[in-house]
Amino acid sequence: MSSTPSTEAQNVARAAHMRHLVESLNNLEDKLREGGGPKKIEKQHSAGKMTARERIARLIDPRTRFLEFGLLIAYDQYDGQAPAAGVVTGIGTIEGRASVIVANDATVKAGAWWPETIPKILRAQEIAMRNRIPIVYLVDSAGVNLPYQDGIFPGQYGGGRIFFYNSLMRRKLHLPQIAAVMGPCIAGGAYLPALSDVIIMVEKTSFMGLGGPNLVKGATGQSIDQESLGGAHLHNATSGVAHYVAKNDENCLDMIRARFRQLPAPPSRPKPTEPAQPLDGIYAVLPADHRLPYNIEDVLTRIFDSDDFIEFQPEFAPEMLCANGRLNGHPVAIIANRRGFLKPRIGGIIYTESARKVAYFVETAERAGTPIIYVQDVSGFMVGLEAESQGIIRAGAEMVETMSCASVPRIVLTINHASGAGYYAMAGQGFDPNFTFSWPTARIGVMEGDSAVKALYSAELDKLKKSGEEIPQELAEAIDQTRADYERWLDAKYAAARGHCDAVIDPRDSREILTIALEVTLHRPRAVPLALETLTL
C-alpha cells in the first residue's frame, strides 16, 4: 500500500476540498453552456431556430449522456466573449449508435469561427476517425471571425485541415458524415457539408454559399436576397448540392435519426459487475495538498469492476501499479502511479525497473488486444548517478516506444500530477491516446512551481546566501510571480482551455465517462496507430 489509512477527519477535509473544486467547475461550465446569454438565445428562438444544445438534446437518445469535450476551450480568453469557442462538440448516442456531434453555437458571435474553433473541430473529427464512428455536423455559422483570420485561415492546422479530414473520412475511411445546414453556412465553410455523405437543409432558415449577398454585390454588382442565392429550395431543386429539405429544426433532427437507424447495429455489451467500493467515497481519497500520499487502490476500486482484478508483479517496482481488470464488464489493462514512500523508493517517480515493467505489461496487453487505461499521477523519471548508471534513459525509451506503437485503445485519466517526461511515458496527449480526461485536481506541466524556482533562481540565491546578503525585493517578487504563474499554468482548467485534455470531469462520473469512452473505442478494428496510418493514407 502507498500510505497508511486516513482518519475520519482527514476524509472529511479531503471530501470538502474536492467538493469545492467540483462546485467551482460546475459553476463555470453552467455559465459556458449559456453560450451568448439569454438575449442571444431568445434571438435564436425568434428566428425559428433551436440553440446548439437544444438541437443536440433533441438528436440523441432520451436518458443518454452527451459526453461533451472541449467545453472549457478559450473560456479564459477574449474577455469571456468566446464560450466553448462557439462550437459544441462531443459524443452522443443516436438510435443506439455512438456518434461524434459538432454543433455551431449561433448565440456566440453568430457561430463564427475563432482561432480555437479550428483545433476543437479537428479534435472531434480525429475522435471519429480514430474510433471509426459516424460524425454529425449541425451547421449554423457566419464563417470566419474576420478580426482573427490570421489564426483561423492559414497554416497546416488551419481551417483547411477540416476539409482534409472530411475528405479522408469520406474517401478513405468510409465513415458516415451527415451535415445538417440549420442556419448560415458561408464561404469556405460550405465545403464542410459538401464533403459529407448526406446534406439536409432547413426551409427558410438555412443558407449555403461561397459568398453571401453582400459579398456577391461587392464582387459582381448583383443584388440578390439570401434565400434566392443559397437557400434550401435552390440547393435541393436547382443546384443539386443538398439532398433533403426539412420543414424545421425538429424535422431535420428526426431525419438524421432516421438515417442512423439504417447503420449497422452497435457492438453488444457484456454483463457488468459493481465496483468493490461505492463511488460516493471517491471525493475523500486525494489529500488537499497534492504532495501528500494516498492509496491509489481507493481510486481504482471505485472505478473498475470488483471481478477479475489481478495485479501484475505486485512486489516488483510497486511504484507502478499494473493490473488486468474490467470496466463495466469490458476487459481492460490498468496502469497507475502509486504515490507515497515505498522504501527505498518514492511513489509517483518512474525508475528503471518500473519503466521496464510497464513496457512489458503494455506488450502483453497489445498481444491480448486489451485496451489500456492510464491513471496518471506521475512526477517524472528518476534522476541522479544511480538512475543513469542503471540505464534510466534506455528503460524510459522502451516504455515510451511500446506505448507509442500499441494499437489497442488507450484512455488517460489524470487525477493529480502529470509532470515532465513521465507525463509523456504515461500516454500523454502527444502520443495520440483515444481520450484524455482530468479530475479538477490534475496538475499538468513540465514541473512544479518550486522546481521551476530552483531551476531559474538557485544560482542567484546561492550566491546571495554565501555573501550573507538579503534577497532583493525585485528578485523576491520575480520568485513569487513564477510560483503564481505555475499555479495557474498547472491548473486542470487552464489545460482544458487550451485543448490539452478532452474534459475536466467530476470524479464521481469517472466510471460512467470512462465506460462511454471505452465502448466508443471498441468500434475500431485493431490496426496500426492512427498517427502511422495517416502517413500512409
Residue ranges and their predicted role:
Residues 1-537:
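Ligand-binding clefts of soluble mixed alpha/beta catalytic domains
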